[in-house]
Amino acid sequence: LMTGGPEQPMRNFKENIMDKKKRIVIALGGNALGNTLPEQMAAVKITAKAIVDLIEEGCEVVVAHGNGPQVGMINNAMAALSRENPNQPNTPLSVCVAMSQAYIGYDLQNALREELLNRGIKDIPVATMVTQIRVNEADPAFQNPSKPIGHFMTKEQALHAEEAYGYVMKEDAGRGYRRVVASPNPVSIVELPVIQQLVNLKNIVITVGGGGI
């Protein structure tokens, strides 16, 4: 699990599994990918080197990732568009999650392809799978939003977001306020059979971004 900067956690992870050549899942924290496009592009280059190290050790890799900062950025941008253009309907958060999966997956798969080619590895494809998750509609998490998304705000900004947009805002570890959304427990992955097929065909699969849609 990567929750901080990408380089050291990935190095430690590699050292721990070097003697266990098997199929592994790597989870990249959304915060570790940065808050801007340049930060994300720099982070995925470091991450790609560590992942390809694992592949050279004989591991098959599936990559999952968070999306808190990224989906918040996308959601804010789409909400601003709706406010400026009355003919533009509001974009559901589910669609914003799909956008974030594609945005993060695009950078990750390009960084992985580049690193594979740099090492002369040409026979391992990389694919991003937009992934949906089944949940229980009665999950109490829908009544108690807890997943932070987007950027940090001051208390005054958070109060404005609550009043103007109906967001649920909570203080986040003394660093400021962030919007929180429901995070129900996953029941099953809709696209799991396709993911399994891709992995069995020796693809590096980037999937379940942000926990799925």
Predicted feature residues:
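Short, Lys/Arg-enriched N-terminal segments with co-localized hydrophobic residues
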Residues: 1-17
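Glycine- and acidic-rich phosphate- and metal-coordinating loops
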Residues: 27, 131, 213
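N-terminal, well-ordered alpha-helical segments
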Residues: 49-52, 59, 69, 102, ...
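Ligand-binding beta-strand-loop-alpha-helix segment within the catalytic cores
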Residues: 81-207
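Histidine- and/or cysteine-centered catalytic micro-motif in compact active-site loops
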Residues: 209-211
